[in-house]
From Swiss-Prot:
The gene is aroK. Keywords: Amino-acid biosynthesis, Aromatic amino acid biosynthesis, ATP-binding, Cytoplasm, Kinase, Magnesium, Metal-binding, Nucleotide-binding, Transferase. Catalyzes the specific phosphorylation of the 3-hydroxyl group of shikimic acid using ATP as a cosubstrate. ATP binds at residues 11-16, 117, 153. It comes from Pseudomonas fluorescens (strain Pf0-1). This is Shikimate kinase. GO terms for cellular component: cytosol. PANTHER family: SHIKIMATE KINASE, SHIKIMATE KINASE 1, CHLOROPLASTIC. Pathway: Metabolic intermediate biosynthesis; chorismate biosynthesis; chorismate from D-erythrose 4-phosphate and phosphoenolpyruvate: step 5/7. Disulfide bonds: none annotated. It catalyses: shikimate + ATP = 3-phosphoshikimate + ADP + H(+).
Amino acid sequence: MRNLILVGPMGAGKSTIGRLLAKELRLPFKDSDKEIELRTGANIPWIFDKEGEPGFRDREQAMIAELCAFDGVVLATGGGAVMRDANRKALHEGGRVVYLHASVEQQVGRTSRDRNRPLLRTANPEKTLRDLLAIRDPLYREIADLVVETDERPPRMVVLDILDRLAQLPPR
C-alpha cells in the first residue's frame, strides 16, 4: 500500500481516525488542511476570507498533489477535496482511499462548536451539511476502495474495521 487516504465530510472523523491509523501502522500522519495552514502561516477561515473558496481550492489542489506523491503516509483530506477532478485522480492514484461516512446528524453534532469551518458560517449549518453531502457523496464513493460508517462508533473500532477490511482487499 503506497498511502492510506481518508476522504469524507466535515465531522466524519478523518483527522481523529487518521492519527490513530498512522499510530497503528507506524506511518506518518498528514492532514491536507493542517499542511496548508503550516505552509501559509494562516488558518483556513482566513484563507477563505482573503482568497475566497477558489483560492483555497487552488492551494488544496497543489497540496494534495504534493502529499499524494509521498510513499507510506496516512493522509486526511478536507471535505471538499473531491470536488476537483485533478484531486480525485491524485487521491485514487495515491493509495488506498477510505471514505469515512457520517450522517448529517452526526456531522452537526461533531462540528457545531468548531468555528474553524468557513462553509458552516451560515444561518442553517445543518442544511449546508445536507446539501454538501448530496453533492459530494457520489464523488467520495467514486474513488473509495472502502466505505466505512463512523456514526455512533468509537474511533478505535472504526480503525480496527478499516485495518481488517484493508487486509481483505486484492492488490491493485
